[in-house]
Amino acid sequence: GSICLEPKKVGRCRGSFPRFYFDSETGKCTPFIYGGCGGNGNNFETLHACRAICRA
């Protein structure tokens, strides 16, 4: 889906939540640290969810 093409977005808050995003350049789901707010749809709690939605 189109959310898989959105850029990684950490957000403006200072939390530290381990998440995954789909890297459209590599075609893989990659871990990153999410700040807790102001993110976008390319933000998954699990690797499985990222792979299932983005077909990685």
Curated annotation (Swiss-Prot):
Compartments, as annotated in UniProt: Secreted; Nematocyst
Keyword Cytoplasm: no
Gene3D superfamilies the record matches: Pancreatic trypsin inhibitor Kunitz domain
Keywords of this entry: Disulfide bond, Ion channel impairing toxin, Nematocyst, Protease inhibitor, Secreted, Serine protease inhibitor, Toxin
SMART domains in UniProt: KU (SM00131)
Bridged cysteine pairs (disulfide): 4-54, 13-37, 29-50
Signal peptide per UniProt: none
Sample GO molecular function, one term: serine-type endopeptidase inhibitor activity
Primary localization: secreted
PANTHER family, A to Z: BPTI_KUNITZ INHIBITOR DOMAIN-CONTAINING PROTEIN, KUNITZ-TYPE PROTEASE INHIBITOR-RELATED
Described function: This recombinant serine protease inhibitor inhibits trypsin (Ki=30 nM). It possesses anti-inflammatory activity in vitro. It blocks histamine influence on intracellular calcium concentration in murine bone marrow-derived macrophages (62.2% inhibition at 10 uM), which can indicate inhibition of H1-histamine receptor (HRH1). In contrast to some paralogs, this protein decreases reactive oxygen species (ROS) level in the oxidative stress agent 6-hydroxydopamine (6-OHDA)-induced neurotoxicity model, but does not show cytoprotective activity on neuroblastoma cells.
Other known facts: Negative results: has no activity on Kv1.1/KCNA1, Kv1.2/KCNA2, Kv1.3/KCNA3, Kv1.4/KCNA4, Kv1.5/KCNA5, Kv1.6/KCNA6, Shaker, Kv11.1/KCNH2/ERG1 potassium channels and on TRPV1, the capsaicin receptors. A synonymy between H.magnifica and R.crispa is controversial.
Family to which the UniProt record says this protein belongs: Belongs to the venom Kunitz-type family. Sea anemone type 2 potassium channel toxin subfamily.
Name of the protein described by the UniProt record: PI-stichotoxin-Hcr2n
Organism, as annotated: Radianthus crispa
